[in-house]
């Protein structure tokens, strides 16, 4: 059995936080792991900005729900499903990804969790410091062959342990280094 592990944002969907930035007019919220590779640092910055500006989880969810899949994403995932198990390994959060998972036909999603109080994102909980890498290592320990695709720094950990790894929609400044 073979599994294809895909990143979500930038690979299958636009970046949610770029839409949040556009909706709020706060440019800094549009930064992604392409700009700040340390995801913990990136999330701390986002939470601080959101708190200072009264931006709620519902605002982020509305931004996510307003996004369309990248061209060809749904047909790509459906074609993969004909021959592989498909897993979305993303550094997003369940509360943010729900509307996009619906548009993708609810593939198996492994991601992180937000801590929310009264619609305010107060913190986050990483499933594992290197969740993407850990997931693929776990699948492989069960005898699965794994293929991985993503678009940014945080996807390289998947490529290191997958049987094959591929960049999709990666900026040249990232893909040319690997």
Residue ranges and their predicted role:
Residues 2-113, 117-118:
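Alpha-helical substrate-recognition element adjacent to the catalytic core
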Residues 98-146:
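Conserved acidic, metal-coordinating active-site core of Asp-based
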Residues 1-2, 149:
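Short loop/turn microsegments at loop-to-beta-strand junctions
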Residues 78, 137, 156-160:
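Alpha-helical segments flanking ligand/cofactor-binding loops in enzyme cores
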Residues 86-91, 144-178:
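Acidic, Mg2+-coordinating phosphoryl-transfer loop and its flanking beta/alpha structural elements
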Residues 95, 134, 157:
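Active-site phosphate/pyrophosphate-handling residues
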Residues 73-75, 132-136, 153-154:
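A generic local structural motif
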Residues 68, 89, 127-128, 147:
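Residues that cap or flank secondary-structure elements
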């Amino acid at each position: 059995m073979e599994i294809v592990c895909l990143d979500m944002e930038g690979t299958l969907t636009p970046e949610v936080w770029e839409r949040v930035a556009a909706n709020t007019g706060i440019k800094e919220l549009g930064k992604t792991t392409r700009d700040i590779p340390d995801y913990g640092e990136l999330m701390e910055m986002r939470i601080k900005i959101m708190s200072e500006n009264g931006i709620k989880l519902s605002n982020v969810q509305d931004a996510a729900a307003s996004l369309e899949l990248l061209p060809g994403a749904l047909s790509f995932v459906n074609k993969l499903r004909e021959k592989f198990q498909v897993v979305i390994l993303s550094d997003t959060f369940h509360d943010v990804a729900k509307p996009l998972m619906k548009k993708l036909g609810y593939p198996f999603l492994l991601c992180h969790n937000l801590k929310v109080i009264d619609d305010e994102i107060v913190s986050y909980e990483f499933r594992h410091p290197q969740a993407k890498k850990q997931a693929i290592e776990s699948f492989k320990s069960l005898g699965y062959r794994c293929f991985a695709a993503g678009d940014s720094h945080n996807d390289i950990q998947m490529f290191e342990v997958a049987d094959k790894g591929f960049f999709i929609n990666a900026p040249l400044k990232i893909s040319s280094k690997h």
